[in-house]
């Protein structure tokens, strides 16, 4: 009985997840007594090894909103196939609201050429050589969601070969 911990939930194990806050906004809700202020945090969570997620958290204080955003991001993780050259297998396109994102693979040494929240999503996914362009809306949340949709649409060469029911060696031959 003496070795029991008082609250085992507070012990957090060390993880390799990284989180970056894309935006913190003060939002208000009009109630009978006036305006109720709270904070909305958009957070991108990733392990830089092919897993990434975007979360939104709202709370009365900034720290609480970020914490909720991280939890929400971990609930909405996607797997991203990354090639040996730390790029993506093929060009892809995603939409989130009025935001459209185009992502293309790039040669080794190119780096992440992208702007805003799309850059954050790609970096935390572990993609090192990629070109991306935001089209339409510049809303950070919709652009992050569009980037996630684009990355979720990626398929590996193995998946394409299985879909076509041919060996992977015959994928390129005519």
UniProtKB/Swiss-Prot annotation:
It comes from the Bacteria. GO terms for molecular function: rRNA binding; structural constituent of ribosome. One of its GO terms (biological process) is translation. Pfam families: Ribosomal_S5, Ribosomal_S5_C. The keyword rRNA processing does not apply. The keyword RNA-binding applies. Transmembrane segments: none annotated. HAMAP family: Ribosomal_uS5_B (MF_01307_B). Belongs to the universal ribosomal protein uS5 family. Part of the 30S ribosomal subunit. Contacts proteins S4 and S8. The N-terminal domain interacts with the head of the 30S subunit; the C-terminal domain interacts with the body and contacts protein S4. The interaction surface between S4 and S5 is involved in control of translational fidelity. This is Small ribosomal subunit protein uS5. The gene is rpsE.
């Amino acid at each position: 009985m003496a070795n029991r911990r008082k609250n085992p939930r507070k012990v957090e194990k060390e993880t390799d997840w990284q989180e970056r806050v894309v935006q913190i906004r003060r939002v208000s809700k009009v109630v009978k007594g006036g305006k109720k202020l709270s904070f909305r945090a958009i957070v991108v969570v990733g392990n830089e090894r092919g897993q990434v997620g975007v979360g939104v958290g709202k709370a009365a204080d900034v720290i609480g909103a970020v914490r909720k955003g991280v939890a929400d991001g971990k609930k909405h993780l996607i797997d991203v196939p990354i090639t040996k050259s730390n790029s993506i297998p093929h060009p892809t396109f995603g939409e989130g609201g009025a935001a459209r994102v185009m992502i293309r693979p790039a040669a080794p040494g190119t780096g992440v050429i992208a702007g805003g929240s799309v850059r954050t999503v790609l970096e935390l996914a572990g993609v090192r050589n990629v070109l991306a362009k935001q089209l339409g809306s510049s809303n950070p949340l919709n652009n992050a969601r569009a980037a996630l949709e684009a990355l979720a649409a990626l398929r590996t060469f193995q998946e394409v070969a299985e879909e076509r029911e041919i060996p992977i060696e015959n994928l390129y031959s005519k």
